[in-house]
Amino acid sequence: MEGTGVVAVYGNGAITEAKKSPFSVKVGLAQMLRGGVIMDVVNAEQARIAEEAGACAVMALERVPADIRAQGGVARMSDPQMIKEIKQAVTIPVMAKARIGHFVEAQILEAIGIDYIDESEVLTLADEDHHINKHNFRIPFVCGCRNLGEALRRIREGAAMIRTKGEAGTGNIIEAVRHVRSVNGDIRVLRNMDDDEVFTFAKKLAAPYDLVMQTKQLGRLPVVQFAAGGVATPADAALMMQLGCDGVFVGSGIFKSGDPARRARAIVQAVTHYSDPEMLVEVSCGLGEAMVGINLNDEKVERFANRSE
């Protein structure tokens, strides 16, 4: 796709493109996390537990989503000093969250040497109308989506990884399942379209035509797609992998549980062996109490996923 900087092609675990571009490098860095688990941590000790459990990366933040829900207030970028301490404590990549549209928070995170930035709806929005222009940054961005249109709009802005929005901090997987099924369902419809129908479909999605066509040709998103929002058990993680995700984010589900280290190891094993029921039985046994979840049928529960489009 000339001029788009978008890469394709998934094959044998490698992205191939004749012409290298800064965006292709970022997508390649994100693809290195495929098949892994990214864990939310609030201090160096938790980061070390995550690394020892086999996490492929950690997300450094001052409050996990469950605490953001419980405490309320404005949720902002974490203290850079705390992020630096976590970076010094582990050898795996470290991510951090910036508010949607807050490009200065992203500039600060890039300046302290963070490996990936999550432009996150879990934090309070800084701009209701504009996301960050992620092409202006050297490091890869992660963005959430509820459907194919949102995913492709974020990729056009420069997102190198897409995740389901789900409902972070609830321990309830239903919204993450809804979002990944929505994306995959639209891709199945797209694959069966004639090429001359794609223009109308792209217009319906409010997504760039070239990315819609590329998705049709690939049969999947042109960047890695992780599950996030409500993953609390090994079974949840395996479910999202069987639904076609490339990896899993786990936030409150680990360190709000009764035995974080054991649950962290179990979720990593579940992602690795997601299609092996016998292994899933083994890793699901004796984990202690899971995090207390939130019933999303309660109208009083704030929907983080609806904060942006």
Curated annotation (Swiss-Prot):
Binding locations of D-ribose 5-phosphate: 40, 169, 230, 251-252
Record's function text: Catalyzes the formation of pyridoxal 5'-phosphate from ribose 5-phosphate (RBP), glyceraldehyde 3-phosphate (G3P) and ammonia. The ammonia is provided by PDX2. Can also use ribulose 5-phosphate and dihydroxyacetone phosphate as substrates, resulting from enzyme-catalyzed isomerization of RBP and G3P, respectively. Also plays an indirect role in resistance to singlet oxygen-generating photosensitizers.
Keywords attached to this entry: Acetylation, Cell membrane, Cytoplasm, Lyase, Membrane, Pyridoxal phosphate, Schiff base
A GO molecular-function descriptor: protein heterodimerization activity
Active-site positions on this chain: 97 (schiff-base intermediate with d-ribose 5-phosphate)
Note: Vitamin B6 is an essential quencher of singlet oxygen in plants, that can protect cellular membranes from lipid peroxidation.
UniProt note: phenotype after gene disruption: Plants have a lower leaf carotenoid and chlorophyll a and b content, and are impaired both in root cell division and in root cell elongation. Mutant rsr4-1 can be complemented by the addition of any of the vitamin B6 vitamers, except pyridoxal 5'-phosphate.
Taxonomic source organism: Arabidopsis thaliana
EC id: 4.3.3.6
The protein's name: Pyridoxal 5'-phosphate synthase subunit PDX1.3
Quaternary structure annotation from Swiss-Prot or TrEMBL: Homodimer or heterodimer with PDX1.1 or PDX1.2. Interacts with PDX2.
